[in-house]
Amino acid sequence: PSRTGYVSTYPENDGDNDIYPTDPARAFQPLTTVLEAGKMLQGKATGLVFTCEFPHATPADCSAHSYNRGKYDWIAPQMVHNDINVVIGGGVSILTKDMEDYLLANGYNVYKNDLKGMRADNNQKMWALYGDKEMAYDIDRNPEEQPSIEEMTRKAIDKLSKNPNGFFLMVEGSKVDWAAHGNDPVGMATDFLAFDRACGAALEFARNNGETAVVIVPDHGNSGISLGR
């Protein structure tokens, strides 16, 4: 996926997550991501916010390594064990009891379809998941059950910004592309606007902080819409 190029600065084979391209000299060695490097080398806090299920391509590209982006049974445990401070997104059914037990044993608070719990949480390590797999499109979202991507972004920034060494946060409006594939222009536009509000939250923090870079990029930046018969 293209996200690997962003977070590792290295091209890869289509369908992989953060491993070197097929080459006998490299033999599928993992590529370190900017999230992992920031954490290991500079002690930065790290976070992921998204609306797809957590082992899906873009969140996984920041925090896991696999020759097949669809192998959630490999990818999900890697993400759980990667010591990411804050994870907010979809995928309640994918978080197994063993994974949840590991998180709880290592100081995380875990919330599953618990909006009030997430809002009240003051711990610096948190996983909050909503929806059996992916979260709802913003236009279909029940605001009493699932947070907006803007709220998720603000919650993550509030937690991560307490680290004196700074932080790395990836925010993905995951389902803009899904709606485009599904010929759903209303879903696409409303999810894009929801993501725009999340970008506004990040830019607001950056302006006030003065030491934060915000990079906004598309990985499905299609140039037009066409309707076929």
Features from the language model and the residues they span:
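A post-motif C-terminal structural segment
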Residues: 1-4, 10-13, 18, 55-229
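Mobile, glycine-rich extracellular loop/lid and propeptide segments
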Residues: 6-13, 24-39, 44-61
